[in-house]
C-alpha cells in the first residue's frame, strides 16, 4: 500500500496538530538516506486540484494501511470525517483504526463492550459496536 496511514481530522480543531503528527511519523526511525520513514496521507499535503474530491479521498483511503482518527467533538460532528470513518468501517477492519484523542471525552463501558455514549463526545456514533474490545488510544489532551 502506498500509504502507511490516512490522517482523518477536523481542520477547525486539529489544523495545527495534524501536520505535526504527520511530520513526526515521517521522521520515526527514518534511515539517513530516505526522505521519510513512511508515507502518511493528509489532505492538505497529498491532494491536488481535482474535479472529484471524494473520489480522491476514497482512493487514498483504499491505498492506506491504517486509519488515524484525531478524535475531538468537532471531528465527530464533521460530515467529511464521518464519510471517511464510514468508508473505513465498511471496507477495512476496526483493528486498523487508531484513535488519537485531542479534545473532548472518550469512555469505555466494560459491561456493554462499547463506548459509553453518555460520556463520549470525541467520536462519531458510527463507531458504536465497531470494536470488540476497548481500544488503546493516544491521549494528547
Could you describe each region identified by the protein language model?
Residues 73-92:
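Conserved TIR/SEFIR loop-to-helix hotspot centered on a Trp-containing motif
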Residues 15, 81-87, 117-119:
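Short secondary-structure transition/capping segments
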Residues 1-70, 88-95, 103:
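Conserved N-terminal substructure of TIR/SEFIR domains
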Residues 45, 51, 78-79, 136:
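Flexible, active-site-adjacent loop/turn segments at secondary-structure boundaries
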Residues 28, 50, 76, 83-84, ...:
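Acidic, low-complexity intrinsically disordered regions
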Residues 4, 90, 94-141:
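Juxtamembrane regulatory segments of integral membrane proteins
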Residues 14-16, 76-79, 105-111:
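Short catalytic/ligand-binding loop motif for oxyanion handling, primarily in non-cytosolic enzymes
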